[in-house]
């Protein structure tokens, strides 16, 4: 059976077959730019579907782990080649589902392909170290082994890159996978899984189950047949997933929220800083865990910098993300839009000054979508809600400070610690920032939202469970170490 039926319905993929869920029910996936555009219908899966997928993954894991890393890597190379042929199709689907602009979606899809090829190559790298023994006649070394079955719970904001940067290392290091994507972008995930299928992965090695997090995601976290769970999403849900995995002794990895600061020092290149702030805050309509949220500016340049941000914001074109002249698309869903608008209202209630934007767009070409104007707040203090909580929308909180020391204190004055950036020409300030900022990603003269696939990704404090994704660091989560002592 194909990934899609004639009714534009997308199926689960379990044990090498495209199948309907046990419930027989489906969930509508709509385009946030125009809710009358139905991207497709996906399965509203049940606990029985989770059971079938986990069983298939367990049955496949022994044969899969017995392949060499190089052999497993070949499947990733083939998948990457197939995805490359379908880049336009996958990117357009991601845009229709999530709302990011088509150039952004194409870039993300290209990145997903690059991630596959990167981890395909990792299958040829060493899996252990030789360690000197105190016994001169003995050999001691480490080797890495797969965990078994990995449950992947992926978010809607990066529907291509994040599922792949979880699945690719899991697979190449010898694990089998059951993925539960966010329902909002489940069609894109189905198209990606179809590429793995065409690449010839053995039945049961990769499985797709769509449906509600409370059933499918929670089911994976609680299932004794799932050896590890990797999750990206909200702090609220992440804590539930982590507690469920911990309760049964399973390995878990959580990547969650951020409240990412950019410090603009009085010696900064203001043009470069303004462009980076606008891009970091408003690209993908602010729906990135690494998006710029707080902009902390020294008082001597505050007014000049504020004007640059306002002018750049006025030039932003908002609309259907598939159109070439659009710079910022819609919010991904009604719930997300309502959440963003509630934070904007909260900012005004607490005394911040809304300088620009922040209005829901609902007339004319916007009437069928989830649109909001990008917003910039002035007169923000660190204790305000909009300076403390993740909004996940196009909202900047401007904070004025007198010194870099004050800026650093405010930057660290949140429960999150994912990404942080500073703009300065002073090497001393750069080094102090690197040393003192509480963030897993530290950016100097660059926007907060930049990530490279070959480097570790993850946060501090409540942004993460303190493991790292991507690059060689992924090996630490997706494998277990055996220490071997050999006495002839």
From Swiss-Prot:
Organism superkingdom: Bacteria
Reactions listed under catalytic activity: 2,5-dioxopentanoate + NADP(+) + H2O = 2-oxoglutarate + NADPH + 2 H(+); 2,5-dioxopentanoate + NAD(+) + H2O = 2-oxoglutarate + NADH + 2 H(+)
InterPro entries referenced in this protein's UniProt entry, alphabetically: Ald_DH/histidinol_DH, Ald_DH_C, Ald_DH_CS_CYS, Ald_DH_CS_GLU, Ald_DH_N, Aldehyde_DH_dom, AlphKGSA_gudD
Disruption phenotype: No effect on vanillin degradation.
Keywords of the record: NAD, NADP, Oxidoreductase
Top-level EC class as recorded in UniProt: oxidoreductase
EC numbers: 1.2.1.26
SS bond partners: none
Positions of NAD(+) binding: 180, 233-238, 336, 390
PROSITE patterns named in the record: ALDEHYDE_DEHYDR_CYS, ALDEHYDE_DEHYDR_GLU
NCBIfam families cross-referenced by the UniProt entry: AlphKGSA_gudD
PANTHER family: ALDEHYDE DEHYDROGENASE-RELATED
Role noted for this protein: Catalyzes the NAD(P)(+)-dependent oxidation of alpha-ketoglutaric semialdehyde (alphaKGSA) to alpha-ketoglutarate. Prefers NADP(+) to NAD(+) as a cosubstrate. In vitro, can also use various aldehydes.
Subunit-level organization: Homotetramer.
Record-stated family: Belongs to the aldehyde dehydrogenase family.
Name the record gives this protein: Alpha-ketoglutaric semialdehyde dehydrogenase
Source species: Bacillus subtilis (strain 168)
Gene giving rise to this polypeptide: gucD
């Amino acid at each position: 059976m194909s990934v899609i039926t004639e009714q534009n319905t997308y199926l689960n993929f379990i044990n090498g077959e495209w199948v309907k869920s046990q419930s027989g029910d489906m969930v509508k996936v709509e385009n946030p730019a125009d809710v009358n555009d139905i991207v497709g219908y996906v399965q509203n899966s049940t606990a029985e579907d989770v059971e079938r997928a986990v069983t298939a993954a367990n049955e496949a894991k022994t044969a899969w782990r017995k392949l060499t890393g190089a052999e497993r890597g070949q499947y990733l190379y083939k998948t990457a080649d197939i995805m490359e042929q379908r880049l336009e199709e996958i990117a357009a689907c991601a845009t229709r589902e999530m709302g990011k602009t088509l150039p952004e979606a194409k870039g993300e899809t290209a990145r997903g392909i690059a991630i596959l090829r990167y981890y395909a190559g990792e299958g040829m790298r060493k899996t252990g170290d030789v360690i000197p023994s105190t016994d001169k006649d003995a050999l001691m070394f480490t080797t890495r082994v797969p965990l078994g079955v990995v449950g992947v719970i992926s978010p809607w904001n990066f529907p291509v890159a994040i599922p792949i940067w979880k699945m690719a290392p899991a697979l190449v290091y010898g694990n089998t996978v059951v993925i539960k994507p966010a329902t909002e972008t489940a069609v894109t995930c189905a198209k990606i899984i179809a590429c793995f299928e065409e690449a010839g992965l053995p039945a049961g090695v990769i499985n797709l189950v769509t449906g509600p997090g409370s059933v499918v995601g929670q089911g994976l976290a609680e299932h004794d047949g799932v050896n590890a769970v990797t999750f990206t999403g909200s702090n609220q849900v992440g804590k539930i997933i982590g507690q469920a995995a911990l309760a049964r002794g399973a390995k878990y990895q959580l990547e969650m929220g951020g409240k990412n600061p950019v410090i603009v020092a009085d010696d900064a290149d203001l043009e470069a800083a303004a462009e980076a702030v606008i891009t970091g805050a408003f690209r993908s309509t602010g729906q990135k865990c690494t998006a710029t949220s707080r902009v902390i500016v020294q008082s001597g340049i505050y007014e000049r910098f504020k004007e640059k941000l306002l002018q750049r914001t006025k030039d932003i074109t908002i609309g259907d993300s598939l159109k070439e002249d659009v710079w910022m698309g819609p919010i991904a869903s009604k719930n997300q839009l309502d959440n963003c608008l509630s934070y904007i209202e909260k900012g005004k209630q607490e005394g911040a000054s809304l300088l620009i934007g922040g209005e829901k767009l609902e007339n004319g070409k916007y009437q069928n979508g989830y649109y909001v104007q990008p917003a910039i707040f002035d007169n923000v203090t660190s204790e305000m809600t909009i300076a403390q909580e993740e909004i996940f929308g196009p909202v900047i909180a401007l904070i004025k400070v007198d010194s870099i020391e004050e800026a650093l204190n405010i930057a660290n004055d949140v429960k999150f610690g994912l990404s942080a950036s500073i703009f300065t020409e002073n090497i001393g300030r750069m080094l102090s920032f690197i040393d003192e900022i509480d963030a897993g990603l530290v950016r100097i003269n660059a926007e907060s939202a930049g990530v490279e696939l070959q480097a570790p990704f993850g946060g501090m404090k409540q942004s993460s469970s303190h493991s790292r994704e991507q690059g060689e660091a992924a090996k630490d989560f997706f494998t277990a170490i055996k220490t071997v002592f050999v006495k002839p």
